[in-house]
Amino acid sequence: MTSRERLENRRASTILDFESMGGLKFTAGVSRYPDGRIAELFLDNHKAGSSIGTLVRDLAITFSFAVQHGADPEAIRRALCRDSQGRALGPLGAVLDLIAAETQR
């Protein structure tokens, strides 16, 4: 396993609000390494105490852990479930699509 690339204690993050999974509302916080690579992702939905909130927070922790150990965020994005038009079916895919679109601008 690749060793973890630590983050600075203080870092800027971007907040994104978006919908996924049939209109459920989510908020994402995205932190980056100084060179611009994604370093950390926080996900939450807008229903305190819900099961989906727990799942998306755990998903974001897993994603963050993976990229801090060398996983390619773009490879993860491409591997996630999509519908027949190529749209992300889940919140992680949806937020990674938003990040990819912002990066291409």
Per-region residue spans from a language model:
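Long, C-terminal-biased catalytic regions of enzyme "large/alpha" subunits
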Residues: M1-R105
